[in-house]
């Protein structure tokens, strides 16, 4: 488990972000928010993929008015993304939003910020301050000459002070940049400057392939320093892909206790089975499991079991047959044509055992 810096806990709907809680995966819808049916359908797909908090754009009154209808039909906390118009924030709060993303300094005069803060306080709704290297305040750019980590932290502290002066402390902060090195430095400095939870992201990271690599490089470095309480992988792709990448990234650092992991070999000339298609099929099969099962798909019956001793269950293919093994020990041989189905059956059994065990632990803790 990667050490994580403790921050103050902040409630978002039925979740708590920060403190000693697990890192939360977020995404954002691509639909027009006023199209309630399309927005709800996309949120449900995101939830099924493992998304825990979802953000919607609220650019106008139609979008703000849709919040209440959307909230009635989804199960995960909903965040309103607001720019400039404080009235949209008030309407979203009235509609039952679980968190508001604003920059207090961009909302306008103090009485407007105060109106949003008072409404958020009354409903117990947190505010996320979204600092972005691409939209820093003019005076900060004039001071530093260009976007810098120090400038981003100064911007964050400025917005934090506005809220703290109004005795508001349910704050989450993001420090996003499209430059990986700048984002890493900004998050490091932010983690030292204040103890509010940090929402991680590399903004405008790119397409599915390039954006995945860029986000993994930047966010991986930040996570490895024990920084971060919630994250979004920003991709020019179906937002479900953002959630999949986020889950894989967290698994890599031992930060996801409710996700399945696939171990598969890179293939070589010794392989006698269609390992690539089998690995893809198994990966898809386990993608929505909410238990920490490790599954191995290997192409060599000689080295396979030994190479995946940590796997809960796996197969190693050979000509015409496969070895089914648990924790590195061979359980039985199965014909090649049914080995994937046999593996799936074993996965189902182990996943059910793990789920029952977790439920039992939960009941014990509640007693």
Swiss-Prot record:
Residues engaged in binding [4Fe-4S] cluster: 265, 268, 300, 307
Entry EC no(s): 1.17.7.3
Record field: catalytic activity: (2E)-4-hydroxy-3-methylbut-2-enyl diphosphate + oxidized [flavodoxin] + H2O + 2 H(+) = 2-C-methyl-D-erythritol 2,4-cyclic diphosphate + reduced [flavodoxin]
A Pfam family: GcpE
Cross-referenced SUPFAM superfamilies: Dihydropteroate synthetase-like (SSF51717), Nitrite and sulphite reductase 4Fe-4S domain-like (SSF56014)
Cofactor note: Binds 1 [4Fe-4S] cluster.
Cofactor annotation: [4Fe-4S] cluster
Matches recorded under InterPro entries: Dihydropteroate_synth-like_sf, IspG_bac, IspG_bac-typ, NO2/SO3_Rdtase_4Fe4S_sf
GO terms for MF: 4 iron, 4 sulfur cluster binding; 4-hydroxy-3-methylbut-2-en-1-yl diphosphate synthase activity (ferredoxin); 4-hydroxy-3-methylbut-2-enyl-diphosphate synthase activity (flavodoxin); iron ion binding
Gene3D superfamilies found in the cross-reference section: Dihydropteroate synthase-like, Sulfite Reductase Hemoprotein, domain 1
Keyword S-adenosyl-L-methionine: no
Signal peptide coordinates: none
Gene Ontology biological-process entries: isopentenyl diphosphate biosynthetic process, methylerythritol 4-phosphate pathway; terpenoid biosynthetic process
HAMAP family in the cross-refs: IspG (MF_00159)
NCBIfam families, per the entry: ispG_gcpE (TIGR00612), PRK00366.1 (NF001540)
Record's protein name: 4-hydroxy-3-methylbut-2-en-1-yl diphosphate synthase (flavodoxin)
The encoding gene: ispG
């Amino acid at each position: 488990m990667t050490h994580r810096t403790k921050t103050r806990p902040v409630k978002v709907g039925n979740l708590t972000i920060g403190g000693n809680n697990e890192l939360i995966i977020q995404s954002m819808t691509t639909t027009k928010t006023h199209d309630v049916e399309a927005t709800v359908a996309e949120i449900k797909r995101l939830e099924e993929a493992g998304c825990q908090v979802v953000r919607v754009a609220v650019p106008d009154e139609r979008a703000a008015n849709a919040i209440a209808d959307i909230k009635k039909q989804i199960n995960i906390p909903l965040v309103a993304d607001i720019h400039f118009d404080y009235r949209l924030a008030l309407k979203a709060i009235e509609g039952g939003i679980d968190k508001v993303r604003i920059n207090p300094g961009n909302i306008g005069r103090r009485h407007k910020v105060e109106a949003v803060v008072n409404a958020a306080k009354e409903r117990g709704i947190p505010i996320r301050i979204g600092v972005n290297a691409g939209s820093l305040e003019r005076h900060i750019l004039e001071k530093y000459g260009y976007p810098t980590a120090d400038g981003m932290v100064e911007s964050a502290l400025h917005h934090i002070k506005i809220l703290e002066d109004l005795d508001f402390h349910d704050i989450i902060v993001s420090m996003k940049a499209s430059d990986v090195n700048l984002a890493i430095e900004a998050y490091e400095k932010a983690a030292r400057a204040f103890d509010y939870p940090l929402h991680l992201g590399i903004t405008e990271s790119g397409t599915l392939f390039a954006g995945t690599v860029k986000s993994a490089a930047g966010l991986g470095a930040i996570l490895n320093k024990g920084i971060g309480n919630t994250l979004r992988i920003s991709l020019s792709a179906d937002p479900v892909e953002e959630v999949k990448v986020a889950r894989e990234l967290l698994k890599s650092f031992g930060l996801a206790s409710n996700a399945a992991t696939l171990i598969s070999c890179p293939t070589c000339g010794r392989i006698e089975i269609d390992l690539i298609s089998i690995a893809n099929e198994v990966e898809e099969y386990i993608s929505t499991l909410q238990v920490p099962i490790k599954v191995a798909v290997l192409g060599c019956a000689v080295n396979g079991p030994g190479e995946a001793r940590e796997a809960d269950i796996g197969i190693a293919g050979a000509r015409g047959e496969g070895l089914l093994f648990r924790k590195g020990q061979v359980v039985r041989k199965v014909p090649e044509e049914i080995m994937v189905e046999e593996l799936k059956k074993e996965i189902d059994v182990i996943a059910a055992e793990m789920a029952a065990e977790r439920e039992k632990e939960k009941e014990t803790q509640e007693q």
